[in-house]
């Protein structure tokens, strides 16, 4: 995961001081890209321990089209805890709703994920293999507008690759989760479409380090990356919406210890 440490170092060396919505303050750069070859291991950060259980459950929650935190809380996942949700646990029309039930002007609801699976199978050379979570008409109704806003798939030589555009990226806390989540989604999509996983390409708009994460970032940069783990996925699952938590097994994960940091809200 040298690419991730390079991003962190680049922002510390070249970032611009910016104010932000949370009042914390950041060092920020605009426009940056990382690439991960999924054939060389699962890109789960090794310079600090990550909670893979949360990453998997959140992705399954997105794919269900769910926007209530009950499923997450039932599975001890606190990514979208009560400070984001209303009194009923609802987050508004966030990721899952846009992915699975994008509202069209004529009253239809478009399942972008199902559509893109169908198109990958039927027309793999299409340049329209895109899913968007950024719906300008509904942004103000969301607990948090989508940070990972749009992703596109690409098929070449039997390999499926994915590029994510992330408009806003909390480098220390959020980005490691985003890398693992979209890498896993790419692997799942590849399996159900009869392809191999290719690359995950991570493109950023505003990539930033919060000021209250500088010490943690410095500690992480002192650590040497270790060998990437391997993600095993149940090969019997051929329906993207049939995956369960038990269908995933991580092998060979040997990270450095966890580093605590405060989320800026």
Swiss-Prot record:
Hydrolase found in the keyword field: no
Biological source species: Neisseria gonorrhoeae
Binding site for (6R)-5,10-methylene-5,6,7,8-tetrahydrofolate: 51, 170, 264
Annotated localization: Cytoplasm
Listed GO MF terms: thymidylate synthase activity
HAMAP family: Thymidy_synth_bact (MF_00008)
Pathway involvement of the protein, from the record: Pyrimidine metabolism; dTTP biosynthesis
Catalytic activity: dUMP + (6R)-5,10-methylene-5,6,7,8-tetrahydrofolate = 7,8-dihydrofolate + dTMP
Known EC number: 2.1.1.45
GO biological process: dTMP biosynthetic process; dTTP biosynthetic process; methylation
Chief localisation class: cytoplasm
Similarity remark: Belongs to the thymidylate synthase family. Bacterial-type ThyA subfamily.
Residues where dUMP binds: 21, 127-128, 167-170, 178, 208-210
Keywords of the record: Cytoplasm, Methyltransferase, Nucleotide biosynthesis, Transferase
Known partners and oligomeric status: Homodimer.
Function (record text): Catalyzes the reductive methylation of 2'-deoxyuridine-5'-monophosphate (dUMP) to 2'-deoxythymidine-5'-monophosphate (dTMP) while utilizing 5,10-methylenetetrahydrofolate (mTHF) as the methyl donor and reductant in the reaction, yielding dihydrofolate (DHF) as a by-product. This enzymatic reaction provides an intracellular de novo source of dTMP, an essential precursor for DNA biosynthesis.
GO CC annotations, alphabetized: cytosol
Identification of the protein by name: Thymidylate synthase
Record: active site: 147 (nucleophile)
């Amino acid at each position: 995961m040298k690419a991730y440490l390079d991003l962190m170092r680049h922002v510390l060396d070249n970032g611009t001081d910016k104010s932000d919505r949370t009042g914390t303050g950041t060092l920020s750069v605009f426009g940056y890209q990382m690439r991960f070859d999924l054939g060389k291991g699962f890109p789960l950060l090794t310079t600090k321990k990550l909670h893979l259980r949360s990453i998997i459950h959140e992705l399954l929650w997105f794919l269900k089209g769910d926007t209530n935190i009950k499923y997450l809380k039932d599975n001890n996942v606190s990514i979208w805890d009560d400070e984001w949700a209303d009194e009923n646990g609802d987050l508004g029309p966030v990721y899952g709703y846009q992915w699975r039930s994008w509202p069209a002007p004529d009253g239809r609801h478009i399942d972008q994920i199902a559509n893109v699976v169908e198109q990958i199978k039927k027309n793999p050379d299409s340049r329209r293999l895109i899913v968007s979570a950024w719906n300008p008409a509904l942004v103000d109704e969301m607990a948090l507008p989508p940070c990972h806003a749009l992703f596109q798939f690409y098929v070449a030589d039997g390999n499926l690759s994915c590029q994510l555009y992330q408009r806003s990226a909390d480098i220390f806390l959020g980005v490691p989760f985003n890398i693992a989540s979209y890498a896993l989604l790419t692997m799942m999509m590849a399996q159900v479409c009869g392809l191999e996983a290719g690359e995950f390409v991570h493109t950023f708009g505003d990539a930033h380090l919060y000021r209250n994460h500088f010490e943690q970032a410095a500690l992480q940069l002192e650590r040497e990356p270790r060998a990437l783990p391997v993600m095993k996925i149940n090969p019997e699952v051929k329906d993207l919406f049939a995956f369960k938590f038990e269908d995933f097994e991580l092998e060979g994960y040997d990270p450095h210890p966890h580093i605590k940091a405060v989320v800026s809200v």
